[in-house]
Amino acid sequence: IVADVGQDTWEEVSIAAAGANLGWSRAEANSCFAKHGPCTLSDYKGAFVQYGREEGKSVTGGYVYRGAQIPALKGLYIFADFVSGRIWSAPLPSTKSPVSAHVQLGQFGRLISSFGQADDGTLYVLDFAKGAALKIVASSSN
């Protein structure tokens, strides 16, 4: 799974096998990037998640949730945005649905630089500014 910071318009997350062509510099996420000549999107491996600059400006890759503490997240890809502090989940793509809708899980006043995963599948958010590792837990309303 590749989280790719965009150029001007889109942040993207793709599943790419070794050597896959994600389209740069002709495509950005699932859109042609007009500054660099002709573009045929079917030539490239598209993103399964993309979001625009109104949601964030620098995607931070995460993990597929495999823990037992939050069953509702099981099998979902958890990722974030470094600038906005938003954390999202998205189902992995399938042949029936190659593009996934992402759901915001929370927004924090933090610079989320990475995630960590414990042996039991517990996920942690890494805060760049404070050097902290914060455990992801279910909200008390769940």
Regions found by a protein language model. Give the residues of each.
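Blade-level signature of beta-propeller repeat domains, shared across WD40, Kelch, NHL, RCC1
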Residues: 113-142
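Short coil-to-beta transitions that initiate beta-strands within beta-rich domains
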Residues: 59, 107-113
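Conserved beta-strand positions that form and line the central face of beta-propeller blades
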Residues: 104
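Beta-propeller domain segments
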Residues: 1-101, 132, 136-139
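Small/polar loops that bind or transfer phosphate-bearing groups
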Residues: 79, 107, 125
